[in-house]
Regions:
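Bacterial Sec-dependent N-terminal signal peptides
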Residues: 1-24
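Phosphate/dinucleotide-binding and metal-coordinating scaffold of catalytic cores
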Residues: 23-348
């Protein structure tokens, strides 16, 4: 019976695992996201004017100063706007959407990127930069889970804020995220901009996403309602592409709250409590993805350790690493895996 199960698992992996092999090596990553070293940039902005005068369709002109390969500052003309309704209302710094023209980026390591997201700390508070590093950690852990992911790049920001006749300079951590069009191009896919029921999305890709959201203890997402996620059509499969993880338990930001975007009973009040929000699917596929995560455990902790040097409070790093390890303790325990994941999967 055990041999029969193993044969079935190999067969399932051969069928559904083709998604991985078909996507590896497709397209090229732009120079901006081909390296891990942080980029140094400088922005001169009025936060008040940015929030007041920009919206989903209205951008303002600005200059992005950055250190080039020669360690000398260069500059790009950009258009930018604040993004994220919740962050605009509740955060001091809103995340930014950047638009860059092809003629301006030609010959720079920004070439090939027409649009970018820039994640900033939410509030002026202790640990604000460490929250950014932990969210970056989430993105980079997801890179290990699946090739269908956003590329990211850490940035050190000299943020010069204009306040009337005064200027206030803050040293912030942030990171750039590639545009969804670049992700689709890199993977020879296409973005789907309409809602599609979760159970109509690819089984294995959906389980990978659900496991990952459970790993970071994130409730602030919905693949059906496209809340903090996109859908890509790749190799005749509909694949979820998640983003925005600052409300997760891994990040554990001071402003984070449990989300009930999917209108299901969660029975938790703390973002650090995990609850599995994925759907019931073939148990063999659950076992396949479980094995994938366990096999990638060492790679994940290598990624976590690589980010340690960027933390200002080393205790924040220790807590984050311990939090991820707790996920693997569940995954590697048959009883815990059944009780906390398999038995909790949703039917509707």
């Amino acid at each position: 019976m055990k041999n029969f199960f193993l044969i079935l698992l190999v067969w399932v992996y051969a069928i559904y695992g083709n998604l991985l092999s078909a996507q590896n090596g497709i397209g090229e990553t732009t120079a901006l996201f081909s390296k891990q070293e942080p980029i140094f940039i400088k922005l001169n902005l009025s936060v008040k004017e940015l929030k007041k005068n920009t919206n989903d369709s209205t951008f303002m002109e600005s200059i992005l100063y950055y250190k080039n390969e020669m360690e000398a500052y260069d500059s790009l003309k950009i258009d930018l706007r604040a993004r994220g309704n919740n962050r605009r209302e509740n955060c001091y710094y809103a995340p930014l959407k950047l638009k860059l023209s092809k003629s301006v980026t030609k010959g720079t390591f920004f070439e090939g990127n027409k649009e970018l997201k820039l994640v900033l700390p939410c509030l002026i508070e202790s640990n604000n930069n460490d929250y950014v590093i932990k969210e970056l950690m989430a993105y980079q852990l997801y890179e290990i889970v699946t090739p269908v992911h956003y590329k990211t790049r850490l940035v050190n920001i000299e943020f010069v804020e204009e306040k009337g006749k005064r200027t206030i300079t803050k040293d912030l951590k942030g990171f750039l995220i590639e545009d969804v069009d670049n992700v689709a191009k890199r993977l020879n896919g296409k973005e789907i901009k309409r809602r599609i029921l979760a159970l109509q999305q690819d089984d294995v890709a959906s389980i990978r996403n659900a496991f990952f959201q459970y790993l970071i203890a994130n409730t602030d997402f919905s693949t059906t309602y496209l809340h903090n996620g996109k859908l890509l059509f790749i190799d005749k499969k509909i694949i979820p592409l998640p983003y925005d993880f600052d409300m997760s338990g891994l990040v554990d930001a001071s402003y984070a709250v449990v989300s009930n975007i999917q209108n299901i009973s969660l029975d938790i009040t703390d973002v650090k409590e995990r609850v599995y929000k994925g759907y019931k699917r073939d148990v063999l596929l659950f076992e396949q993805v479980r094995k994938e995560f366990i096999d990638n455990k060492s790679k994940m902790f290598e990624t976590i350790d690589r980010l340690e040097k960027y933390f200002e409070d080393k205790n924040q790093f220790i807590i984050a690493k311990r939090f991820v390890n707790e996920f693997f303790e569940i995954l590697q325990n048959d009883t815990a895996f059944k009780n906390k994941i398999l038995d909790q999967a949703r039917e509707d």
